């Protein structure tokens, strides 16, 4: 993305050739397929509807009201940013709004295909228009602002408004390339290829794509963890469950033509690189020794195929971080087999004010975690640690049995979690071995991305009074899903029907409260730029609500009601003048000021000035750290080592609180 173009007679010739190419798309309207349901879709549709209504934890009625919700979701999934359809299109689709419930039950998918075919044509028209905008060089001197997120705006009234949206969209794409150091001929060539590739992918759309999208519009209206997987995606899911894929260890999704990183697999290559984060966008993928391919607008499965490869090989990714004015950068990652056993728990000892504090990092609840943790605790006990921090940040969960077994390492016996099914039946999972692996001061560090099994463990430690929970409010994913094939043994279809994943149970703490939606609220909260009102289960549409049941029979081990305020006061005094927490508070302030800004300038000077300020602020922060460490300042950002890591101030503070905890226990 950073290669430069030297002007010459050859360059001028290439520019002219590109201009001709721009006005002539490689595909005609007739190349866009008119898709129709396949024979197996009727049966699959009725079975999906029947399965959800009969077996889902959430009891719902598939009626006209629910039909309207599915309709709105389907339109949103087809044109989330309201940049392809106009208001007349949407009004015409409205005839189907109250009919989808009956169609889902009967297996009639005609509405879904009629709507999808219209959207395909509208997408073709928009990309055709985008190509015409590349006939002449785009200038970035005017005052012009691009609306980034149009989802809450009204639908465009007509093609004139859509044309203006796309004029700005093309200018936005071109300016991003300009800011990455490209000259106009290369910008033109890149965007011509990008938009023609987008049209090409329209021509490669299959009926299975339509059916999967439609079924997921239905599924997401039931709850956010319910989904339909097409036969191809179901096969990929099984491969992942068998741990046979080799790649970078990232969960991807498509959002407004971008391949976005939804989450990172703990212990995987991407997470280990520490250069990629959830929310980042992959805009280019290249193989070792080959040119990076622009993947904006690509199908997700095609991007995944580019990223996957043999273990030990390298993949080059162009990354555009989250944020309106972010600068892209390139990361090289060595592919590896993504195996659960590679995400093992590990421990280390940190010394603070004469106290030895063990830190136990648990990236996921893999099978065998409790046994690994027991071994690590033996090591920590041998080193006579004064306390232990269990680090569950970014731990998305895993095996429920391991959450129960892990809890058992810190209590003698007792209930750990309650599980209720859709019939109201409650099962209590607990520990009964009467053995404790560590009985000293214990803290649990969580963040907003600690979910599921992580929340079960943290909640149990909190309810028993066995540990003090630190950090951020956790994610709030307190449900159990089941994965089932739609096929029956007696089916005679040539093609499989796909699979469904749906919610069947809900978790409850031993105090009776659910972890669903609310998550676990820490005893001592850390400053964070992550707003629980904007991230987590509670933000998801149709998330199951928090509720409570009767508490399980358990005995509280400790009551820290008087100790927590003392530790919290020491924590506040410590971070008040702490430089790193000062940086965090600056970030929180900046985020609050900028989070509702929904436009970005298309003026080059303005954008360059914004980026220069961001770079200057970052360099100043880095050099404040260097000065505090007694090290030489960086001359510029290029001088910063590629493997530079910022201090883990949250973990450092958790260690300090645990040391305070140990002191208080001794006194």
What are these regions (language model features)?
Residues 3-21:
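Gram-negative bacterial Sec-dependent N-terminal signal peptides
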Residues 25-33, 45-57, 95-99, 193-197, ...:
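Acidic/histidine-rich, surface-exposed loop or edge segments in extracytoplasmic proteins
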Residues 36-37, 50-62, 200-207, 223-235, ...:
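Cleft-lining beta-strand/loop regions that shape enzyme active-site pockets
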Residues 37-79, 87-89:
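N-terminal-proximal low-complexity accessory segments that begin disordered
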Residues 76-77, 98, 112, 117-128, ...:
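PDZ/PDZ-like domain segments forming the peptide/carboxylate-binding groove
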Residues 122-247, 253-256:
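Extended, domain-scale alpha-helical bundle/helix-rich regions
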Residues 180, 184-193, 509-667:
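Conserved functional hotspot residues or short segments at active or partner-binding sites
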Residues 465, 470-533:
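Polar, glycine-rich mid-to-C-terminal structural blocks
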């Amino acid at each position: 993305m950073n290669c430069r173009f030297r002007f010459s007679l050859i360059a001028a010739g290439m520019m002219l050739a590109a201009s001709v190419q721009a006005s002539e798309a490689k595909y005609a309207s007739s190349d866009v397929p008119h898709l129709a349901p396949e024979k197996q879709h009727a049966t699959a549709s009725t079975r999906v509807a029947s399965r959800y209504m009969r077996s889902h934890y959430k009891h719902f009625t598939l009626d006209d009201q629910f039909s309207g919700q599915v309709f709105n979701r389907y339109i949103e999934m087809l044109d989330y940013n309201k940049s392809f359809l106009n208001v007349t299109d949407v009004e015409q689709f409205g005839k189907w709004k109250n009919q989808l419930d009956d169609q889902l039950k009967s297996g009639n998918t005609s509405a879904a295909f009629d709507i999808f075919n219209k959207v395909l044509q509208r997408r073709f028209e928009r990309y055709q228009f985008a190509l015409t905008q590349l006939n002449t060089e785009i200038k970035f001197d005017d005052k012009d602002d691009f609306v980034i997120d149009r989802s809450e705006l009204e639908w465009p009234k007509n093609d004139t408004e859509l044309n203006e949206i796309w004029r700005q969209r093309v200018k936005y794409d071109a300016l991003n390339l300009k800011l990455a150091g490209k000259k106009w001929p290369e910008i033109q060539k890149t965007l011509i290829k990008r938009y023609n590739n987008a049209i090409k992918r329209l021509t490669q759309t299959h009926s299975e794509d339509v059916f999967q999208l439609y079924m997921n519009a239905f599924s997401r209206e039931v709850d956010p963890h319910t989904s339909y997987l097409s036969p191809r995606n179901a096969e990929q899911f099984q491969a992942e469950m068998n741990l046979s894929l080799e790649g970078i260890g990232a969960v991807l999704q498509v959002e407004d033509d971008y391949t976005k990183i939804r989450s990172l697999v703990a212990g995987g290559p991407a997470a280990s690189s520490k250069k990629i984060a959830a929310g980042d966008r992959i805009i280019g993928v290249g193989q070792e020794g080959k040119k990076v391919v622009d993947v904006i607008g690509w199908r997700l499965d095609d991007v995944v195929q580019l990223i996957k490869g043999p273990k030990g090989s390298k993949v080059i990714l162009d990354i555009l971080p989250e944020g309106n004015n972010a600068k892209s950068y390139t990361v090289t990652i060595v592919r590896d087999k993504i195996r659960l056993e590679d995400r093992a728990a590990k421990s280390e000892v940190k010394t603070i004010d004469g106290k030895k504090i063990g830190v136990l990092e648990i990236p996921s609840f893999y099978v065998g975690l409790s046994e690994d943790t027991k071994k690590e605790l033996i090591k920590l006990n041998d080193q006579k640690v004064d306390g232990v921090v269990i680090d569950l940040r970014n731990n998305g969960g895993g095996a429920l049995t391991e959450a129960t077994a892990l809890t058992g390492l810190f209590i003698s016996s007792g209930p750990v979690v309650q599980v209720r099914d859709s019939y109201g039946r409650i099962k209590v999972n607990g520990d009964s071995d009467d053995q404790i692996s560590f009985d000293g001061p214990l803290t649990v560090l969580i963040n907003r991305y600690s979910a599921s099994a992580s929340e079960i463990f943290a909640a149990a430690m909190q309810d028993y009074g066995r540990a003090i929970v630190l950090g951020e409010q956790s994610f709030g994913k307190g449900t159990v899903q089941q994965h089932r094939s739609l096929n029956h043994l007696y089916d005679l279809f040539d093609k499989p029907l796909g699979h469904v994943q749906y919610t069947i149970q809900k978790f409850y703490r031993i105090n009776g409260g659910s972890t669903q939606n609310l998550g676990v609220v820490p005893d001592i909260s850390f400053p964070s730029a992550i707003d629980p009102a904007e991230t987590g289960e509670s933000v998801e549409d149709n998330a199951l609500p928090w509720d409570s049941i009767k508490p399980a029979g358990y005995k509280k081990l400790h009551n820290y009601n008087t100790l927590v305020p003392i530790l919290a006061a020491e924590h506040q005094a410590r971070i008040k003048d702490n430089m790193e927490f000062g940086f965090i508070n600056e970030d929180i302030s900046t985020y609050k000021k900028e989070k509702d800004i929904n436009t970005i300038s298309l003026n080059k000077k303005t954008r360059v000035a914004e980026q220069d300020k961001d770079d200057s602020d970052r360099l100043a922060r880095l050099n404040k750290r260097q000065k505090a460490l007694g090290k030489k300042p960086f001359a510029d950002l290029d001088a910063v080592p590629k493997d530079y890591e910022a201090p883990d101030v949250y973990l450092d503070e958790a260690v300090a609180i645990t040391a305070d905890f140990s002191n208080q226990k001794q006194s």
